[in-house]
């Protein structure tokens, strides 16, 4: 009731409040948050990923209209050209090593050829140490390499500035290999620049690469650095009257935390959902003790068309509340988060499959929901 009264007063007076959360790749959570924002139009939602992939997300959204990240199946690759992408580590969520190793084992029968992997990078990485050719390059040269590949493969644009002769030789060699088997080749990059990431997507589109999957992309992150920077600016300038956080600890993970901490303490209202009294919780007016994930219901769509259910393994041990259940109470709903998950799945996700069967299996696949086409070319 206290939270509802505060939020209602802020809404009546059009005082700006921000809901700052982690990425929730949960269709039901997104639905509840959307209803919450509809009831309180003065509240804006900002998604914050402590380890950001905002540039990659921006690029994919600009070209394909969905805030997501392309997925890759390296088991289909004959040529892998990586520009500062440590994809054998935690690049874009990780999980690529198994597909990569499938084409890296010599075949004694010689019926299958090993994939060729070249790594252009400014610092030694796990992926670079496993490459057939590792080419050290300055960060400024890495962008030129991407531009050169784009220009040669798509036939668009001109590249200004020259490359080191050794690097130039490797780039030309890459282009020759790619053009011999374009649909079995892939170009990836870890450069934190949305323009570079757009070029990477357009290169792979031009190659008609079978390695990249844009129709069922990864939805594990949604953070937007532009919105985050706007939030920080509004917080420090006193334009915000309230902040609600869930699943994030910005006073630990953001830079310049002393200045942000001081601004956070000057808010008229601050509510932190947290399992422990972390740095952000200590500076908040109110702390809402949340369930551990082992005590919680949840649904997830980590990859487009792949839906998963999470069931609690134990009852809540303490007097805690799940973030989604709290929002439902603020919305005066009699339903629990579990009830909403069940209703949402039955009405919007399941196609002829029963809820009980999905609950037993723990997942449901629907690959008919999306067929993305490029909305932008260069």
State the predicted function of each range.
Residues 4, 30-33, 146, 200:
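Hydrophobic face of alpha-helices
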């Amino acid at each position: 009731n206290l939270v509802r009264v505060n939020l209602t007063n802020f809404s009546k007076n059009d005082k700006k409040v921000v809901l700052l959360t982690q990425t929730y790749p949960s269709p039901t959570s997104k639905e509840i948050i959307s209803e919450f924002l509809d009831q309180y139009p003065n509240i804006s939602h900002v998604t914050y990923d402590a380890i950001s992939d905002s540039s990659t997300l921006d690029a994919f959204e600009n070209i394909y209209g969905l805030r997501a990240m392309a997925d890759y199946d390296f088991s289909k690759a004959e040529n892998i050209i990586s520009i500062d992408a440590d994809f054998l580590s935690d690049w874009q969520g990780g999980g690529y090593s198994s597909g990569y190793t499938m084409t890296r084992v010599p075949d004694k029968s010689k019926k299958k050829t090993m994939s060729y992997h070249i790594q252009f990078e400014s610092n030694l990485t796990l992926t670079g140490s496993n490459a057939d050719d590792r080419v050290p390059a300055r960060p400024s040269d890495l962008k030129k390499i991407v531009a050169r590949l784009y220009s040669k493969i798509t036939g668009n644009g001109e590249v200004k500035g020259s490359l080191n002769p050794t690097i130039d030789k490797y780039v030309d060699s890459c282009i020759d290999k790619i053009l011999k088997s374009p649909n079995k080749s892939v170009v990836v990059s870890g450069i934190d620049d949305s323009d570079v990431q757009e070029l990477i997507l357009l290169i792979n589109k031009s190659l008609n690469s079978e390695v990249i999957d844009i129709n069922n992309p990864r939805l594990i992150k949604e953070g937007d650095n532009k919105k985050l920077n706007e939030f920080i600016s509004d917080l420090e300038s006193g334009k915000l009257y309230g902040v609600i956080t869930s699943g994030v600890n910005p006073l630990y993970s953001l830079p310049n935390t002393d200045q942000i901490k001081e601004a956070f303490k000057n808010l008229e209202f601050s509510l932190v959902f947290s399992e422990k009294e972390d740095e952000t919780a200590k500076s908040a007016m109110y702390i809402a003790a949340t369930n551990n994930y082992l005590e919680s219901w949840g649904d997830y769509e980590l990859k487009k068309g792949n839906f998963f259910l999470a069931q609690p393994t134990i009852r809540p041990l303490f007097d805690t509340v799940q973030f989604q259940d709290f929002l439902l109470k603020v919305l005066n709903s009699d339903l629990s988060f579990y009830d909403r998950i069940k209703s949402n799945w039955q009405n919007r996700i399941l196609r002829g499959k029963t809820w009980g069967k999905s609950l037993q299996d723990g997942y449901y696949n629907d690959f008919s929901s999306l067929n993305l086409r490029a909305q932008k070319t260069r």
